[in-house]
Amino acid sequence: MTIREITDKILEYHPKFDASYDGCDGFKSGNPDDECTGIVSALVPTVEVIKKAAALGCNLLYVHEPSYYSTPDYPDWRAGFENKIYEEKKALLDQYGIAVWRDHDHTHAHNPDGIFTGVIKYLGWEQYRVNADTEGMTMYFEFPDMTVEKMNALLKEKMCLNGIRYIGNPKDKLKKVAMVGHLLPNIFEHQPTTGDGFCKEYATEVIRIMEEEDVDAIIPGETIDWTVMSYIRDAVQLGKVKAAFNVGHFNLEELGMKYAADWIPEVIGNAVPVHYV
């Protein structure tokens, strides 16, 4: 089975996109018509991951995040200066004959979300989710016996982290926790303030659920300090039970690519070996 036939099978598994789709998904290196020798699922095609894929005898890297340091994730370097790191990385991929294929938009469009299904599975939180039948980027969990320090320890263990930046009183009990989207300036909203004078940015919606839906703690991806994180810091200093666990974008979604190595073999009929790195 060729690399292109493998990726076509994965696209058939995902919801169909309009033919005009011109997003970040697709090939970033390699020859799609080469025979596939094996697949490595990884969040990011780092130099270390590339070398591990080669050692495993795999020539297809199935990834979720950018290869070459830009948001559009072009397969070439588009700037007015030379990027020697890009050149060396590209040469390494060419040397090993590895194709990089990115699946970001399609897997997030999956229902349920292809990344966060894996995150929830490998955290062991399926039984705690309380809005499993609803769509949207916010997922709620209710725990019978959870504290800030227990959550911190659990996330470190399950995500294989040395430490987590968090806000909260370690002994506070957490009942309702929300896994939320990225907390960046004006993200998900092109016009954060409308005619009624209210702020409509996503961060304000996260504050609303903490105020009105009894959410005690959040686990976001990307963060900035001046919106929700500042709100939570002030809440804690006022003696309220609020917390945030800033695990980081890549750390949060890593388990989703571990999950991909579970479902890809079935989708491709076990045609080639599939590894998670």
Predicted segment positions?
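Hydrophobic structural segments
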Residues: M1-V277
